[in-house]
Amino acid sequence: MNKKSIRDVDLKGKRVFCRVDFNVPMKEGKITDETRIRAALPTIQYLVEQGAKVILASHLGRPKGQVVEEMRLTPVAARLGELLGKDVKKADEAFGPAVQEMVAAMNEGDVLVLENVRFYAGEEKNDAELAKEFAALADIFVNDAFGAAHRAHASTAGIADYLPAVSGLLMEKELDVLGKALSNPDRPFTAIIGGAKVKDKIGVIRHLLDKVDNLIIGGGLAYTFVKALGHEIGLSLCEDDKIELAKEFMQLAKEKGVNFYMPVDVVITEEFSETATTKIVNIDSIPSNWEGVDIGPKTREIYADVIKNSKLVVWNGPMGVFEMTPFAEGTKAVGQALADAEGTYSVIGGGDSAAAVEKFGMADKMSHISTGGGASLEFMEGKELPGVVCLNDK
């Protein structure tokens, strides 16, 4: 990575405005999944050890520029204190005189959590005045929120106009892993692209066709490709306006010598429920009033074999409706193949794929699970991320 990180700057006694991603799921004021808080710990601990005054900023939910009581970061600050084993202060605002007083009272190694930055309308507009207010609190800006790096907001990008800007350890790791995958991958390099819609994955498929040896597709988006081959797909998801594009992608794969894998059999159902009746049929035999909801057992074996023989696998998007038990086997099988593959480096591209490996208890068997769904997708499309571009070069 050619951007400066916290390892490249002197932090002792400095006020550090550190943008983290504490956007954790909450239920009735309780945190239901603290993965994102834990992911930020190495950076926070490093800043503390180096004697910085650590000012943490994050969003939580979508309050749309106003104060929403249940989206305050108070429970997050409390949990962070427990995880760090130290006293963590919490401000009621994200800038202003009261916050400046709290910062002025900080000693080296102290940690202060600011209030939800999206309580201010200027945050998502990347308002320069708000960015200046944030910058006034600190000497250095650290961006460790890879999950929000694709957003040009006041606390992720705008603030970098007024302070030296470096990455945290989590951001640095994300950029190193994803950057190497795209620029200098170990081969064979396989991408697994799933999820519901072709339109969400157009950019990533197009960009990866130039880089991968194998492209595997699954999930709802696969049926548009199946239809493009002239097969009937019953009531399965299909984007008719993307059929020509699907044909173009399959042709491009052929021209570039990329092995293009799509389902040969699928799990079909007549109803979406936990107790649904399912059948397994070949891909060209989906009846008119049935819907494809998962990849079938033959497909799972083929995909597992490709995975096993790959050196690098990037996975973005599930193979079926994994949230429901009868339609989860395909996604589980891909996760299992990655967990079992020896000598294969696995990169899970955030979002639903990350949720799936967590759900099936396979997370600790993956080499790298990205903390950013949208951010990792845009990175894999070859786009520049505003929260990265704004950091100082080495």
From Swiss-Prot:
Residue numbers bearing the Phosphothreonine modification: T299
Modified-residue entries (Phosphoserine), positions: S183
Catalytic activities: (2R)-3-phosphoglycerate + ATP = (2R)-3-phospho-glyceroyl phosphate + ADP
Locations listed in the record: Cytoplasm
Pathway linked to the protein: Carbohydrate degradation; glycolysis; pyruvate from D-glyceraldehyde 3-phosphate: step 2/5
Assigned EC number: 2.7.2.3
CDD domains: Phosphoglycerate_kinase
GO molecular function, one term: ADP binding
Top-level lineage group: Bacteria
Residues at which substrate binds: D21, F22, N23, R36, H59, L60, G61, R62, R118, R151
Keywords assigned by UniProt, alphabetized: ATP-binding, Cytoplasm, Glycolysis, Kinase, Nucleotide-binding, Phosphoprotein, Transferase
Residues binding ATP, per UniProt: K201, G292, E323, G350, G351, D352, S353
One record GO biological process: glycolytic process
A matching Pfam family: PGK
GO CC terms of this entry: cytosol
Family: Belongs to the phosphoglycerate kinase family.
PANTHER family: PHOSPHOGLYCERATE KINASE, PHOSPHOGLYCERATE KINASE 1, CHLOROPLASTIC-RELATED
Record note on quaternary structure: Monomer.
Protein name as annotated: Phosphoglycerate kinase
